[in-house]
Each structure stands twice: as structure tokens, then as C-alpha cells.
Design a protein with these regions (language model features):
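Alpha-helical transmembrane segments and their immediate juxtamembrane cytosolic regions
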Residues: 2-343
Length: 343
């Protein structure tokens, strides 16, 4: 860790990865609990857009400067394949899910983000010559229009790549100094707390009516699939605006000083890859039923609270070792491996 480490961004990432885990845990029970629907919907309004914004914010050193660091593209793709293989092995051989298939470039589940990162890095490198405002506006337009194409879907996770690309661009182009100054405003922080409380109340008391729009939060499906073939573009634009608003709120209210959770924000990659297989295993082996036996009235609360120790355990440093090796690959090392294994 360097002396210039941005603890605020680490804290934000710690919060976001915790929300990722909570959101995926809640998704198992959205059909049986209105509270789970609320948790899922509110989290998905902003957690991936903000995560992707931060991904763009921190990717500048990879894209800018001299040689394009293609190793990052390769690293993310290797991690994507690794995650995909873990999921495939778990479903196919661990739990004998017969319809499980392995399609290298077709991904609609949790590993999609890692494949998208490889694509976004390439896109930003190719497109960075264009004016930022123009590129962001075009990307937003593309994100809205793509929903009208029912043929774009999980191949190369293309729908999500296009829908979430504006957030990646915003993170990449935002000026660091202005960004830090903006986040230091105490007045805006107070205003953000008010917006957060109002947003939570609005979503909570209207979840029965708005939950039907959950498909717009994932960026995966066409408007036809979401049963909004005409007004889908309007709803996506609304999602963009809400995502920006709540992401800004999150950035403003998270503390900038080092906390006990800061270290978690420095190890989000390993948590992202390992959490879903763990959650799936817990659910498969009747872990929720065990909580019911403890408290029939409060078992769902206990179930969600379990996400905290899951995040903490998965942030243990040794668990990140294989992923860190992959992320630190160097082109020279890759060429040596290739030369040792010629066709």
C-alpha cells in the first residue's frame, strides 16, 4: 500500500462488493419476499453502474501513456474463463444440472463483467481519440437504441457491454482533481443523505409496482423481452439518470478516511469471483433452512446478514493469490510461455 492510496475509493469499492453479495443472495428469494425484492431492486439501481464507473476511473494507466498494456485485456479474459469454468464445474458435476453447457463467448451469468472489462479496455483505447462529450453522448444513445434489437444478447455479453459502457467512459474521462474536490463538499454530502433516504422510502413503498422493471437494471435483455417494445428507451434513460444520481450519492456519503473495511475494497476481485459459487453451495445444502430452524420470523434477515462474514472471509489475502498472479501478467512473460509451447 502506498502513502497516496485513496481510502475513499477503497471504502466505496468495499461497500459495492458487499452490495453485490447481498444482491445475489437476495435474488434467490425475490419470489417469496417483498423485502428481498426491495433489497435486490434498490441495490441494482446503482451498484454495477458505479462499479463500472470506478473500473473506468482506475483503468487510465492501462490505456494512457506509451505502450497499450494488452496484458490487462488478457488477464481479465483469463479470469473470465476461470470463473466460467468454476461455475460450469459446480453446476455440471457438483450439482448435476443437466442443461449446463459451456459456451466460451456466450455469458449471461455473473462472469459477464470480466469479459466486458476486456472489451471495454480495447474499446476505450481505440475510441479515446474522439472528443469525450461526443463519445459519452453516442454511448448513451447506443445503450438506449440497443434495447430495440432483440437479437443482441449474451454473445460476448454484448448487450451489457453497450448498455453499461457510458459509465465506464465517464469514469475514464472524469478529471481527477475536480472529482476529488466535488466529493469533498460537506453541503453536497448532507444533500446526498436526504436523497438517499427519500430514494429508499420511494422504492420500498412502491416495490410492488416497480419491480416489474427489474430487467432494465441488468442491461441484459431487449425491450421486447422486457415487454416494453415501444417505451423501453424511455425506461432505460430513466435508469441511466437514477444510476448517476444514486452513484453520486454513494460517492459523497462514503467516508474518505481509512476504516476497518478499507482493506476489503482493495480485494474486491477475489470476492467477486468466489462469492457466487459459495452462495450457491450454501443454498444447495439447505443453509437457509437451517436459519429457519433458528428463527422462522427473522431467518431472511439472518440470511442477508450472513453476507457480511462472507465478504470478510473471502477478502482474506491468501484467497487472492491466484487472481493477483493473473492480473500481474506481463507481456514478456506471456511470450516466454508461448515460446516454450510452440505449435
Amino acid at each position: 500500500m502506498t502513502l497516496n492510496r485513496d481510502f475513499k475509493m477503497d471504502n466505496v469499492k468495499a461497500l459495492l462488493i458487499t452490495l453485490v453479495v447481498i444482491g445475489h443472495m437476495a435474488d434467490f428469494y425475490v419470489n417469496t419476499s417483498e423485502n428481498m425484492k426491495f433489497i435486490y431492486f434498490f441495490i441494482y439501481l446503482f451498484h454495477m453502474p458505479l462499479f463500472i464507473f470506478l473500473s473506468g476511473y482506475f483503468i487510465k494507466s492501462t490505456v494512457n501513456g506509451g505502450r497499450f498494456k494488452v496484458e490487462k485485456v488478457i488477464s481479465y479474459f483469463i479470469l473470465y474463463l476461470l470463473f466460467k469454468l468454476i461455475m460450469y464445474a459446480l453446476f455440471k458435476y457438483g450439482f448435476s444440472v443437466e442443461e449446463t453447457n459451456f459456451n466460451t463467448f456466450n455469458e449471461g451469468n455473473v462472469p459477464w463483467y470480466l469479459l466486458a472489462m476486456s472489451i471495454w479496455i480495447i474499446l476505450i483505447y481505440v475510441l479515446k481519440q474522439f472528443k469525450p462529450v461526443f463519445l459519452v453522448l453516442i454511448s448513451v444513445l447506443a445503450g438506449i437504441v440497443i434495447g430495440y434489437d432483440s437479437f443482441v444478447g449474451d454473445y460476448l455479453t454484448l448487450s451489457r457491454v453497450i448498455v453499461f459502457f457510458p459509465f465506464f467512459l465517464l469514469g475514464y474521462y472524469i478529471d481527477h482533481n475536480k472529482f476529488v474536490t466535488f466529493l469533498s463538499s460537506q453541503k453536497l454530502r448532507f444533500f446526498s443523505l436526504v436523497v438517499l433516504i427519500i430514494s429508499i422510502l420511494v422504492v420500498y413503498f412502491n416495490i410492488g409496482n416497480i419491480y416489474q422493471f427489474r430487467g432494465f437494471l441488468t442491461g441484459r435483455n431487449s425491450y421486447e423481452v422486457l415487454k416494453q417494445p415501444i417505451y423501453g428507451g424511455f425506461y432505460r434513460m430513466l435508469f441511466y439518470l437514477l444510476a448517476v444520481l444514486l452513484s453520486t450519492v454513494c460517492l459523497l456519503i462514503v467516508p474518505k478516511s481509512k476504516t476497518i473495511f478499507t482493506i476489503i475494497g482493495q480485494r474486491t476481485l477475489q470476492i467477486y469471483i468466489l462469492h457466487f459459487p459459495l452462495i450457491f453451495i450454501l443454498n444447495h445444502f439447505y443453509f437457509p433452512e437451517g436459519l429457519v430452524s433458528i428463527s422462522q420470523q427473522h431467518w431472511l434477515k439472518l440470511y442477508i446478514l450472513i453476507s457480511i462474514p462472507i465478504v470478510i472471509v473471502l477478502s482474506f489475502k491468501p484467497l487472492g493469490w491466484p487472481f493477483n498472479i493473473i492480473m500481474r501478467l506481463k507481456l514478456r512473460g506471456l511470450l516466454k510461455i508461448y515460446n516454450k509451447n510452440p505449435d
